[in-house]
Structures are given as structure tokens and as C-alpha cells.
Amino acid sequence: MSIVVENSTVLSALTEKFAEVFGDTKEVEYFFSPGRINLIGEHTDYNGGYVFPASITIGTTGLARLREDKKVKLYSENFPKLGVIEFDLDEVEKKDGELWSNYVKGMIVMLKGAGYEIDKGFELLIKGEIPTASGLSSSASLELLVGVVLDDLFNLNVPRLELVQLGQKTENDYIGVNSGILDQFAIGFGEVKKAILLDCNTLKYEMVPVELRDYDIVIMNTNKPRALTESKYNERFAETREALKRMQTRLDIQSLGELSNEEFDANTDLIGDETLIKRARHAVYENNRTKIAQKAFVAGNLTKFGELLNASHASLKDDYEVTGLELDTLAETAQKQAGVLGARMTGAGFGGCAIALVAHDNVSAFEKAVGQVYEEVVGYPASFYVAQIGSGSTKLDVE
């Protein structure tokens, strides 16, 4: 899969930078990997539930070419002070202080471990447009970028699902975050103006046209610093696993995603701990909420869809406790504005971004009003972007 890139100015600048860093631009190939938003279905992916994400046009661009030796040379426009990071193909152990290059190493390790031959070094220059710690999946975007780069340079012909799974494996086993498959799947399988209803239990999925009529999806960035590995993400993972384990003493289930709300409520005595009950209740209710939301979305009932966004945020705040002052201020202020059908945090939480479904004609006033309240409450400004739904990770045709 390849697309003709639209932003030639960005590529021209990156091409010049590649020549400056690596000497020339002979045989350079161009790649792009998006970020993602999750419309609804939060913290359900690692609980065997449904998610409803879409890839966005903000992402990570890469320029790459093969070398004849085994040296890997990396440069990021986002971290110029790090300069060129260099390592040998046979020395791919994770290193502290080399945060972004660890994702490259991880993908090399996972692809080689899956039996794919990567026998030469390469040069890779990247530029990420996704704000770090925004909850728009800058790490998964980079993993899938590296995946499509290596797939192309070495003619590996890796099936897209396997590439997505190796991206998740990099996150879980190499980086050390117990994430589900939502981010990598959305980024690997994304299509222009389509969202993905994904059953994370079976990996069956449905592409759903995004028909918003007179509404826009506005991304609201808290600009709060956050690192997923330092957050309570892994703690929530462990809590829902423990709740599942306790419910399995009587129920024949493999994941919380198999339960209806009624089945869950009838068996909370098995869990016996109020915190664990709250965590599991969010996973179950959010999963069922996501299925209802997708049906409303397809039917064009954006009002109902918006109400479910609001309910999702409330559950993430009260039961899963992953929001905090910044996300609550954005989402709850957004919900009160004219022309807004719904708003919720998106991503892992603990900072990052929220999204709102806003009438197109109200967007400017919305951003001003929410931005003003946020800065008054939090003490620094939020950032706002209107989301554009774009393609998944791909090689670019540069003419």
C-alpha cells in the first residue's frame, strides 16, 4: 500500500536534512505512520473488549535507506541534541536514555525473532508531529513506521496483522508497557475517513465510514507531561486481571469483555474488593457502551453517540480513575458548550488528550471558551486540533 504525499514542503525539508546528516539522498525511500484517536472503548482492548479508533493525519514521517554494513544510524528531528544514534545490528539491547531508538531496536528484535531476515544496517531519519505524551499514540506510530520501513527495505512481505502484533509485542516485551492492541491496529489498518470497530478478543474488525455531517472531532491536548511506563497504566492492567481471575472461580469466561452489564452486576460478590469491582465494572460497561455507540454512529444518531462519549468519560473518572484535573476540566467544560454533543478523554489517561464532537460553526468559539477555563483552572494553556481521519502506516510515493 502506498499513497502520494500531500505535504511536499515537509518532505523537501526532511530530504535536505537527510543529506546533511547522512551525506546524500541516494536511494532514499519515504514513509508515513499516523497517530490515532479512540472514539470510544477505553481500556477495553487488554480486557478482551471492543474499541472504536481511527487513524489521523498527524503522524510520523521517516526517510530511510539500506547500508552495506551492519551499522544502524538514526536521527530524529524531534531530538536534535541526541545527534545520530548508532548501533550495530547485532547489539540491540535496550538502553536507558535512548528513548526513541529503543522502539527501533525493539522492532528489529521482534521481526528477527519471528524469522525475518534483517542482515544489513540502515539509516533512518524521522520527524514526529504527534505531541509526546499526548495520548495520540506517538510510540505505536513509531513502531509501525519502523515496521513498514524494515518490511520495505528488506522485502520481508510481513502480513499487516503480524506487523501490528509485533508492534504490540515491542511495546509489551521490549519497552515494558502492558498495552493492548488498539493503538497498533488502528495505525496499521487505518483508512481515510473510516473508523475501525475492533473486537480485541477475536481481532475481527469492521471499517465504519466516518459521516459527521455538520460536526467536527476536536482534539484537546492537556499539554500535561506524562510517560506511560511511569503512569498507573500497568497497575490498572493488573487490577482488571485480578478481578477477572476472581470471577473465573465461578464463571466460564476468558475475558471481562464476554460479560453483559447484568451478568457482571450479578457476580460482583466474586471480586469482593470495591476498588477491583470499580475497575472491572468500567471494563465491562465500557465494552457494552462501545457496541451501542457504534450502532448509533452507523445509524447517524450523533446525539446518542455524544451521550455515550459523556458516559464513557464519567466511567473513566469515577470507576477507572485515570482522568485527573486536566482531563476532567477539558472534557467537562467541553460538555457544557453550545454545539457540543459529547466529550471524553481518549487514550490511556493520566494527562494526554480529550476529544469533543462539536458543531462545525461552533469550533472557534468552543476552543476559545474551553481554552480560557482550562488555563484559569490548570495554569497553562491547552492545545486544540480538528481531527482529520487519514490512512494507516505506508510507504509514500514521492514524485
From Swiss-Prot:
The record marks 36 as: Transition state stabilizer. It is found in: Cytoplasm. InterPro entries: Galactokinase, Galactokinase_bac, Galactokinase_CS, GalKase_N, GHMP_kinase_C_dom, GHMP_kinase_C_sf, GHMP_kinase_N_dom, GHMP_knse_ATP-bd_CS. Substrate binds at residues 42-45, 233. Catalyzes the transfer of the gamma-phosphate of ATP to D-galactose to form alpha-D-galactose-1-phosphate (Gal-1-P). It holds the Pfam family GHMP_kinases_N. Gene3D superfamilies: 3.30.230.10, GHMP kinase, C-terminal domain. The lineage of its organism: Bacteria, Bacillati, Bacillota, Bacilli, Lactobacillales. One of its GO terms (molecular function) is magnesium ion binding. ATP binds at residues 76, 133-139. It comes from the Bacteria. The keyword Metal-binding applies. Mg(2+) binds at residues 139, 171. This is Galactokinase. It catalyses: alpha-D-galactose + ATP = alpha-D-galactose 1-phosphate + ADP + H(+). The active site is at residue 183. One of its GO terms (cellular component) is cytosol.
